[in-house]
UniProtKB/Swiss-Prot annotation:
Keyword annotations from UniProtKB, A to Z: Amino-acid biosynthesis, Hydrolase, Methionine biosynthesis
Enzyme Commission designation: 3.2.2.9
Stored CDD domains: MTAN
Note: Was identified as a high-confidence drug target.
Residues that coordinate or bind substrate: G80, L176, M196, E197
Gene name for this UniProt entry: mtnN
Active site, UniProt feature: E14 (proton acceptor), D220 (proton donor)
Gene Ontology molecular function terms on file: adenosylhomocysteine nucleosidase activity; methylthioadenosine nucleosidase activity
Entry keyword Hydrolase: yes
Reaction(s) catalysed by this chain's protein: S-adenosyl-L-homocysteine + H2O = S-(5-deoxy-D-ribos-5-yl)-L-homocysteine + adenine; S-methyl-5'-thioadenosine + H2O = 5-(methylsulfanyl)-D-ribose + adenine; 5'-deoxyadenosine + H2O = 5-deoxy-D-ribose + adenine
GO cellular component, one term: cytosol
Protein name: 5'-methylthioadenosine/S-adenosylhomocysteine nucleosidase
Protein family membership: Belongs to the PNP/UDP phosphorylase family. MtnN subfamily.
One GO BP: L-methionine salvage from methylthioadenosine
Length: 255
C-alpha cells in the first residue's frame, strides 16, 4: 500500500515551488489550515500551510497524521544558520531536533529540558528528539552525489555550490536576530540551524509513532543582518529545500 507523506511548510515562499509541481491537486481547509492533496513525482502527498511557530505546526502535524492518514511527515523550508562554518544556501537535514525555548527558568536563565518534563516532575536524561537512524541512512544514501545549483547573481550568489549537512536543528518560538544568542545556542546545544517549527513535528510524530524529517535551507545567519538576508534569499533557498524533498520522496514513502 502506498504511503502518504505529509509535507508541512510555514510560509508561502516555502510552499510555492511544491504547489507549482503538485498534480491532481485537491484542496480543503481544516481549522483555518489549507491542505493540498495530490502527487509529487507519482508519490502521494498532502501539502500543508501551517503558519509559523510550534502551536500551528503541532496542530497541522496532528491533522496530517490523524485525519489525512499520513505515515511520514516532513517539514521543508528555511532556517537561520548557527554554525559559523555554514553559508546561506546550505542545506541542514536534522538528525536531532531540540526545543531550545522549553525548560526551567533559574537565576534569570533558561535551562533547556525535554518537553513534557521538568527536573522534579517526570525527570529525564533525554534532550531532543532523534531521527530514526534507518531513515537518516536512507536519506544519506539517496542524496549521495546530489548537487544543488549556486544561488543566482541576482540573489547575491557568488558561485559557491550549496552543501548538505546533517546535525542538530534547534526550534523555538522566536525569530533569532541576535549574534550573541546565535553563538550561545551553537556552543551550548550544538545547533547547526535554528527555526520555529521542527521540534513540534518531532514531538507530534513521536506521539503517533511515525517517522519524520526536517529539511532546512539557510536563508540567513541569525545575526544582526538576518532580516535583510532573509528577504533577499528566502525564495531561492526555499526552492532548494523543496528540491531536496523531491529527491527524497522515494525513500520517505518506504518508511
Amino acid at each position: 500500500m502506498a504511503v502518504t507523506v505529509g509535507v508541512i511548510c510555514a510560509i508561502p515562499q516555502e510552499l510555492a515551488y511544491l504547489r507549482g509541481v503538485l498534480v491532481d491537486a485537491k484542496r480543503q481547509q481544516v481549522a483555518q489550515i489549507l491542505f493540498d492533496s495530490g502527487q509529487l513525482d507519482a508519490h502521494r502527498v498532502v501539502l500543508a500551510a501551517a503558519g509559523m511557530g510550534k502551536v500551528n505546526t503541532g496542530l497541522t502535524a496532528t491533522l496530517l497524521a490523524d485525519r489525512f492518514g499520513c505515515r511520514t511527515i516532513v517539514f521543508t523550508g528555511v532556517a537561520g544558520g548557527l554554525d559559523p562554518e555554514l553559508c546561506i544556501g546550505d542545506i541542514v537535514i536534522a538528525d536531532r531536533v531540540v526545543q531550545h525555548d522549553f525548560g526551567l527558568l533559574t537565576d534569570e536563565r533558561l535551562r533547556p529540558y525535554q518537553p513534557g518534563h521538568i527536573p522534579f516532575i517526570e525527570p529525564t536524561e533525554r534532550l531532543g528528539y532523534p531521527v530514526d537512524p534507518a531513515v537518516i541512512d536512507r536519506v544519506k544514501h539517496r542524496l549521495d552525489g546530489f548537487t544543488l545549483a549556486p544561488l543566482s547573481t541576482a540573489a547575491g550568489g557568488g558561485g559557491r555550490q550549496p552543501r548538505i549537512y546533517y546535525g542538530t536543528i534547534l526550534t523555538g518560538d522566536q525569530y533569532l536576530h541576535c549574534e550573541r544568542t546565535r553563538n550561545r545556542l551553537h556552543h551550548e546545544l550544538g545547533g547547526m540551524a535554528v527555526e520555529m517549527e521542527g521540534g513540534a513535528v518531532a514531538q507530534i510524530c513521536a506521539s503517533f509513532d511515525i517517522p519524520w524529517l526536517v529539511i532546512r535551507a539557510l536563508s540567513d545567519l541569525a545575526g544582526a543582518d538576518s532580516g535583510v538576508d532573509f528577504n533577499r534569499f528566502v525564495g531561492e533557498v526555499a526552492a532548494s529545500s523543496a528540491r531536496v524533498l523531491l529527491r527524497l520522496l522515494p525513500v520517505l514513502t518506504a518508511c
